[in-house]
């Protein structure tokens, strides 16, 4: 038997754990691509549903295919009464990611994936239902309202905003949500995606794979960076105060979320896109504090540590300007990244072998058992 290769590096940094045709991350001259398309081009000119179709079905849709796909998703938005009842029983102080996890798992009980031929239809069902799962629980637990889980909004981003606020969203807000969902849709073998692939490699059902991925994203070292960034940004009332506060945090070696990346070395290509849209939202509402504070923190982190903002940092202010509660930031990530998770599940299933690495043992040497009477 060939000697097993011992992997080095905390968190398996730099190790290749498999093959994918879905995305590239951090390659020179590319930054981030989905099936060969630069994410910046997709964010500029595509609908999120086009990107979802690209990831899940393999190619960008034609105009007719996109219209059919959006109609299909529109018909799948409502929630079963039993799921609404479950969501009503979840308290307002529950972690929203727990709500998403429970909603996904319960839907898998009443609308199961009977075999793998249903994988795309079940993914489309989750893609259509996730905004309603999040908003139905939030509006019921916080406002006491049983909302209509359907809307005439053609896009998932517009539908989410409509359910959350109970009214038709502005064109600018719909555009920004569309861009945000595209930017978060896929990102190679990140922790939650790899979790989904490990689960898929056992030939488990789609709902189990997605539920496992949600559980992984719930951890603060993976999801939640935009929430933590928002909480930090809101502490400061001016750019000057932000600079002083950031320097103090660096001196105390506090963790500052929203900066740096495990793969990108010089910049996160998603950041430049969402920063521009955050600025447009700031101008729309006449903001004179939040965006300048964000820029002050950004500049200080670069000057002091040469750390660049990742996709999460300016997402915080963008979501805030659209009236989205901070606690819902990471569940939005779920609504988007579902497309990447599911595409990886499909890919794993298509050429599967159970993922079962070995561990390097670092414990005590083999020893003789001593009966309890002699210990």
Regions found by a protein language model. Give the residues of each.
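Non-transmembrane, aqueous-exposed alpha-helical and coiled segments at domain scale
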Residues: 1-375
